[in-house]
């Protein structure tokens, strides 16, 4: 019997506001423990919350970007639970009437087909504090308590771990592009829980689901869902009874581990938050927010394909972050060579950034300098290989490529006569390579080309070298 996964994701995104959702404390990441707190976010008696207007605006903005309808009348609710990281012993969230409903994200599958993943709801809520477990006991830092979140709940439309990853990547790119969240998974500002069950292919009935936590990267999400799918299929095949439970992903051992049996909604005893009034959102307010939404990543990718003629894959990669998209577009326009701009950014520049763990905004050179490098190569002033060395220098120093080329004497030699003299000398000194070539070993020419490039210290035009080596070898 063949099985399919039924997957839904719950994504928490910390909002990029300066202050917390119900008080004026800073949301800045880091800081000494328990220094970004006040009576409101500590839940002290007599303190009253006041809803941050910017949080509501960001909730509306996210909803519009994700094709949701906005609930014009919504309210905040109390979710009651007892845990050390929740100082009030309840969380102010939204239950029955969230700010957004019924949206979707469109992802592209491996076969090129597009698939809509439904979004059931988006609701606003506050984050909890952070627990630090030590040998001496458990410490609590409430700096994060009260930081504003939106929780984006997908419908169970996802069928594979790969689809789940594509959905989360697309969601992350949209949220960061509209600047409602910085989506830094390593800092916990984008967190994802997954719900998964399995059922026979063709069945409409849902199986018993597990919720998986602690998936703090795209790789962890895919591996955890794959592991849990295999675990469910094995259990069902053996006739074992699965129970609804919450599990966490153990990265070190690549397994999911039981945390607790899954709670039900009524375990939290939701009821309306009496200290906050019902929220009324006007059409005028919605339209004001709509005007602040920039070109979305998938829209930008489509424009890049049409305007610059680059492949769809390149456009999708370049628009994963708006900083990269902006850098590419400026370089493409200034260099008048969009494909070269794409190749440099997706290739050598991305490699250098990964090695140093930096982002596009941290680069020491700008699009105009990269465009200048591309023009030097296209004008045959330097070779592509020399260009890579110049880029390394630009990456370290931020110098202009023209200055680097002049300082280091890297101008390409395009003089066929001068190069021919070197080619003849190399061939004369390597008769065995000519014999190998005559005997059908084509690699022998590559060896000779390499010697010529070494002799000219990489300055000879590679195209001219290849042509002359081939011509001279065929004369022998």
From Swiss-Prot:
UniProt enzyme class: ligase
Enzyme Commission code: 6.3.5.-
PROSITE patterns: GATB
Reaction catalysed by this enzyme: L-glutamyl-tRNA(Gln) + L-glutamine + ATP + H2O = L-glutaminyl-tRNA(Gln) + L-glutamate + ADP + phosphate + H(+); L-aspartyl-tRNA(Asn) + L-glutamine + ATP + H2O = L-asparaginyl-tRNA(Asn) + L-glutamate + ADP + phosphate + 2 H(+)
InterPro entries (UniProt xref): Asn/Gln-tRNA_amidoTrfase_suB/E, Asn/Gln-tRNA_Trfase_suB/E_cat, Asn/Gln_amidotransferase, Asn/Gln_tRNA_amidoTrase-B-like, GatB, GatB_C_1, GatB_Yqey_C_2, Gln-tRNA_amidoTrfase_suB_CS
Gene Ontology MF annotations: asparaginyl-tRNA synthase (glutamine-hydrolyzing) activity; ATP binding; glutaminyl-tRNA synthase (glutamine-hydrolyzing) activity
GO biological process: glutaminyl-tRNAGln biosynthesis via transamidation; translation
Keyword Cell inner membrane included in the entry's annotation: no
Protein family: Belongs to the GatB/GatE family. GatB subfamily.
PANTHER family on file: GLUTAMYL-TRNA GLN AMIDOTRANSFERASE SUBUNIT B MITOCHONDRIAL AND PROKARYOTIC PET112-RELATED, GLUTAMYL-TRNA(GLN) AMIDOTRANSFERASE SUBUNIT B, MITOCHONDRIAL
Known partners and oligomeric status: Heterotrimer of A, B and C subunits.
HAMAP family: GatB (MF_00121)
Name of the protein this chain belongs to: Aspartyl/glutamyl-tRNA(Asn/Gln) amidotransferase subunit B
Source organism: Clostridium botulinum (strain 657 / Type Ba4)
Gene that this sequence comes from: gatB
